[in-house]
């Protein structure tokens, strides 16, 4: 049995962490992004399928490429963020399964059912996006996840050559605490959970 993480770690990951809308002018290095990936990749996925693919958009050119895909409410904060991660999924994730899941012929589960492959890729890349958020927080970075963008435009701009499909965007950097909104309420256990 694992030991519980301490209260401070729980605060860092959950109770004191916030979704940021404004960013300090402080860069995020390639080494930091690799450290985030090396942490998030350890989170579980179905049959270790690991379908998430990430483009870390950080250059001025990359941000301008992203600009026309953004909803108006997400434009300013995304252009200001040091990094915007496009979390996508690879529909052909199963080609990596002989390496990632060598216990059996898991690849055939998905090549024989395109619908299962698509559902698995979307579900598990969403799960990995959550791991990305918590890995950023664990590494001292703030995040601002968003779904307000035009997926077709993002896919055309960034994934025309590889067929990946965008799932969500996550701004990454050092959040400006002066631009935080008040914390919104959450549902109680009794409002959201059942015991069966």
Swiss-Prot record:
Its cofactor is FMN. Coiled coil: none annotated. Keywords: Flavoprotein, FMN, NAD, NADP, Oxidoreductase. Its EC number is 1.1.1.298. It catalyses: 3-hydroxypropanoate + NADP(+) = 3-oxopropanoate + NADPH + H(+). SUPFAM superfamilies: FMN-dependent nitroreductase-like. InterPro entries: Nitroreductase, Nitroreductase-like, Nitroreductase_HadB/RutE, RutE-like. HAMAP family: Oxidoreductase_RutE_HadB (MF_01204). NCBIfam families: PRK05365.1. This is Probable malonic semialdehyde reductase RutE. The lineage of its organism: Bacteria, Pseudomonadati, Pseudomonadota, Gammaproteobacteria, Enterobacterales. The gene is rutE.
């Amino acid at each position: 049995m694992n030991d519980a993480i301490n209260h401070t770690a729980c605060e860092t990951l959950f109770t004191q962490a916030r979704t940021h809308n404004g960013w300090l002018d402080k860069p995020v290095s390639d080494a930091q992004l690799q450290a985030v990936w090396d942490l998030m990749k350890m989170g579980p996925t179905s049959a270790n399928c690991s379908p998430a693919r990430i483009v870390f958009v950080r250059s001025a050119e990359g941000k301008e490429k992203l600009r026309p895909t953004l909803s108006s409410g997400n434009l300013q904060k995304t252009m200001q963020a040091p990094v915007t991660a496009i979390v996508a999924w690879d529909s052909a994730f199963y080609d990596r399964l002989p390496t990632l899941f060598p216990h059996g012929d898991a690849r055939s589960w998905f090549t024989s059912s395109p619908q299962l492959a698509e559902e698995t890729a979307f579900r598990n890349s969403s799960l990995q996006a959550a791991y990305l958020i918590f890995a950023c927080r664990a590494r001292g970075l703030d995040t601002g996840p968003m779904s307000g963008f035009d997926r077709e435009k993002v896919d055309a701009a960034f994934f025309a050559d590889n067929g990946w499909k965008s799932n969500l965007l996550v701004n990454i950097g050092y959040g400006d605490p002066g631009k935080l909104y008040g914390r919104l309420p959450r549902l109680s256990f009794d409002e959201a959970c059942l015991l069966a």
